[in-house]
Amino acid sequence: PWLSQTNHGKGYIAINETPWDSKYTIDHDDRGTRLQFVWLTSLGKMRYKRVVRYSFESNMDYNRACKIYREYVKETGLFKSLKEKEVNLNKISELQQCAVVHTGIKAHTEKDSRFYSGQKDVIHSFDSVKEMIQKLHSLGSFKLYLHLDGWGDSGYDNCHPDYLPACIEAGGWNGLESLQKSLSTQNDLFGLHDQYRDYYYTAKTHNENEAIQLEDGSVLEHANWAGGRQNYLCASLAPKYVKRNYTEILKHIDLDCVYLDVFSCNEMDECFNPEHLMTRKECMEYRRACFQFMINRGIIPSSEECSDWAMRELVFSHYGPYEFMMKEENAKRMGIAV
């Protein structure tokens, strides 16, 4: 969370030291660019002092701004190098050698989803993915990392957090285990897509009382994704479901990596439900706890974007810089991704 402005070699970097309850606004028009931090309340109140650290220099460009920020994260303990992470995650060096293969098993769209247009389910067996990876090796591919979507029985972005078992129509636990063992034999790495924010009404244990509650007592609801009608699961409860699910998953397969969707990309949530009251800062810590759960089991965690609060745990991300995902493929890019 930092901004920088330069003019003929002079400039500053502004580092948001209290980012939990803040955002920024950008206006970019023919009058120029205007950018500012905006402070938000925390559970309805301005609870603490808000701080932005400005550093002014006469020899400033984006490289220098990045170096100042790097010094800052080392000073404050936000920084942790890959070498340090490799102490607990010994396959990081192997991951660096991999090409990424991103594919899916089952796609299902609920009728109340905004994506629904009458499409049928699409299912690829675990064996077909195993054969695809073997084919890639026969064509000359070396070490691969398989990122697998839609491997749960309900399909991609469906029924979270109650998506188990492994997709029965694709081969079930035996099929997933066979795929994992084949990857291991070929010295490839294997990771699963997972999600603990989108909270679907189709989940067997769905309970609206566990969803994020807004200040007025209402519960946010939409049907933007394939799984249809949903709320947001309060992050204070996410570690419970992570532990429950992976206690079962790890009975069947060994894992090298796990991708916890949206955690490092979407904004922090706050929850006004008195049974699990949560600030945005606490939300951040609960999400970190989910990453740490993986680390404690030797599983490399990843998520959607490179956010500094998560860098002590995250090893890699899938959509950094995320901004390019929000525009047409050939649209003009905005600024320099640093």
How would you describe each model-predicted region?
Residues 90-243, 251-258, 264-276:
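Aromatic-lined carbohydrate-binding/catalytic grooves of carbohydrate-active enzymes
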Residues 263-264, 307:
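Catalytic metal-binding/acid-base residues of hydrolase active sites
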